[in-house]
């Protein structure tokens, strides 16, 4: 299945709009290029609707938040939904601060996300509307182990159904 997805990306070569973490922006661009797509980065509210309109998808990463980026995320997300473009949310650090948690929850209320990816604590925070994380790492109490793997999978499936999104629990 992954091979088919990559083949489709290489054949279509979509432009992907990224409102992403300044720490990882270069890595994100290079991975998108390596997959056969083209990245474009813009978080300026006066620019994002035009950029989103010419793209095949939108990646929103809340790793470096400020008032301007939040405004840009909302504007781009609304435009992507209007155009039926794929939209992904990476709720980096949701649960670490009230700004991150409230922003992630608000984005989910305002924007239809096709995919939500995050560590287990970030996803639990989105599901409950509050939670804790160890910065950008999952809280130790949330660690997925052999013993609770079935429970974690059931949780991810339930949240996927509730949110209407594909849910990917990744990282530590």
Feature map (PLM): residue ranges:
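Small-residue (G/A/S/T)-rich helix-start motifs and N-terminal tracts that mark the onset
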Residues: 1-74, 78-81, 86, 153-172
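Residues that cap or flank secondary-structure elements
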Residues: 20, 68, 95-96, 147-148
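Acidic-enriched, low-complexity/disordered segments with a strong bias for Aspartate over Glutamate
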Residues: 27, 43, 47-50, 90, ...
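Short secondary-structure capping/turn micro-motifs that flank functional sites
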Residues: 48-49, 96-97, 124
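Short beta-strands and strand-loop turn motifs
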Residues: 58-61, 86-91, 135-140
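Active-site-proximal loop/turn and secondary-structure-junction residues that shape catalytic pockets
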Residues: 64, 93, 122
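Glycine/small-residue-rich loop that forms an oxyanion/phosphate-binding "nest" at active or ligand-binding sites
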Residues: 69-118
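Conserved phosphate/ATP/ADP-binding segment of small-molecule kinases
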Residues: 99-172
